[in-house]
Design a protein with these regions (language model features):
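Transmembrane catalytic cores of multi-pass membrane glycosyltransferases
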Residues: 47, 221-332, 353-355, 359
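Short hydrophobic alpha-helices at membrane interfaces in multi-pass membrane enzymes
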Residues: 166-167, 186, 190-191, 195-223, ...
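Hydrophobic transmembrane alpha-helices
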Residues: 115, 119, 123, 190-201, ...
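Transmembrane-helix signature of polytopic, lipid-linked glycan biosynthesis machinery
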Residues: 343-356
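Membrane-interface junctions at the ends of membrane-embedded or membrane-associated helices
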Residues: 1-5, 198-216, 245-266, 322-333, ...
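Hydrophobic/aromatic-rich transmembrane helices and adjacent perimembrane loops
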Residues: 234-235, 355-380
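Alpha-helical transmembrane segments of multi-pass membrane proteins
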Residues: 112, 183-194, 318, 361, ...
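Active-site lumenal/periplasmic loops and adjacent helix-entry segments of GT-C-fold
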Residues: 21-190, 194-197, 230-234
Length: 386
């Protein structure tokens, strides 16, 4: 339960975060001159300009995405819809400036939602308010030890930069800083997982197809999430499926009842049914449309060498292990969700797909919760959290 004073702190923290992350952009606009014009982007400039191109397409009347960077025949894809809609809110003169301003308003809005969703999800498991705040700050702003490679002059170790510098899904800050559609998608993913774990379904002998209101609500939320990043629906359903497998093991060991597993299965079924239209559309279009297939072939988001993931997460892993051990002793159903997430992650990020790295979405938040839970379970707060 989030109290009123927590909401005030959360709003203030969110505003401070989006203000600080806006400073580099404000400096860019303030220092442009007659000889050069600030593009509106600090990192990922090519991606940023592509978002502006999508907004121009929206202004021109398009409701489906067609890239302007090729003359390959295109029917249009139901993707990047938020940017197409933003473009429809602009008009000459100074249209590019309007688009850049709308992009950053979208970034601020998405950043606030991401901060709020992270805090809400964390609060379900962490009871001490001061630790909730530290965990939220770490979840949205934190990183691993990748910076050490930069200091040591090994920035291209194993052929890639440290994950902190280019992978928004591995942590979170880059989404908040420059990729609003991913920040908003993470917020929706976390809210769905929050609803899934907050209301534990009651064990019963009811039919597997009995309506589950929570499952329907999550399905609708994730269906909407699909307009921002459809792959996160796969992540969410995949996580719940992994959790169900973990619960089945618990039931087999007679730690929980099989009826409890059936109740969770019912919830998963309704989530999948309601969010399925977006998944089915993408599956069909990206396997049959020639342009979509060609676009997917070049859209490679591969995971780096495993050393980079170890360097990214090694600092929290020991605390997360101890935290999960304590968590499991008090709440096996919820703890098994985080345990399942950690076990499937290595297989996901090296699965034979072109978007490996995207499948790490949200894991950083789970790792932070598991690590902070160890501190939360202590009877005395550490001095540095007083």
């Amino acid at each position: 339960m989030i109290e009123k004073n927590e909401r005030r702190w959360l709003l203030l923290f969110g505003l401070v975060v989006v203000l600080i992350t806006s400073i580099p952009y404000l400096i860019g606009f303030a220092t442009q001159g007659e000889e050069w014009v600030f593009s509106g982007f600090i990192i990922g400039v090519e991606d940023g300009n592509s978002y502006l191109a999508k907004m121009f397409s929206g202004y021109s009347g398009d409701w489906l995405f067609k890239t302007p960077y090729t003359n390959f025949p295109q029917e249009g894809l139901l993707t990047y819809l938020p940017y197409l809609i933003l473009g429809k809110l602009t008009s000459p003169p100074a249209q590019q400036e309007q688009m850049i301003a709308l992009f950053h308003l979208f970034r601020v809005f998405s950043g606030l939602l991401m901060v709020g969703a992270s805090y809400a999800f964390i609060s379900l498991f962490i009871k001490k308010i001061v630790l909730r705040r530290w965990a939220t700050a770490l979840a949205v702003l934190g990183g691993g030890l990748g910076w050490l490679l930069i200091v040591l002059g090994k920035s291209d170790l194993f052929g890639s930069l440290p994950l902190e510098f280019y992978s928004p899904e591995s942590f979170g800050f880059l989404s908040l800083f420059s990729l609003p559609h991913l920040a908003l998608a993470r917020a929706l993913l976390l809210w769905g997982l929050l609803w899934y774990l907050k209301e534990i379904p009651q064990a019963s002998k009811s039919s597997l197809w009995q309506k589950d209101k929570v499952g329907i609500k999550i399905g609708l939320l994730w269906l909407f999430m699909g307009f921002f990043q459809p792959l996160y629906i796969v992540v969410g359903i995949g996580l719940i499926t992994a959790h169900l497998l973990a619960l089945s093991i618990l039931a087999w060991r007679k730690t929980i009842s099989w009826n409890q597993c059936i109740a969770f299965s019912r919830r998963l079924i309704w989530i999948a049914i309601v969010s399925a239209p977006m998944l089915v559309y993408n599956l069909i279009i990206f396997s049959t449309d020639p342009f979509a297939k060609a676009w997917t072939a070049q859209n490679t988001i591969a995971s780096p060498h495993i050393f980079h993931y170890l360097l990214a997460y090694i600092l929290l892993l020991p605390f997360a292990f101890m935290g999960l051990k304590r968590f499991y002793s008090t709440d096996r159903i919820r703890a098994s969700f985080f345990l399942a997430w950690g076990l499937v992650l290595p297989f996901w990020v090296y699965a034979p797909v072109s978007v490996q790295r995207r499948l790490a979405e949200g894991f950083w938040v789970a790792l932070v919760i598991s690590a902070i839970y160890y501190l939360d379970a202590q009877k005395e707060k550490p001095l540095w959290f007083q």
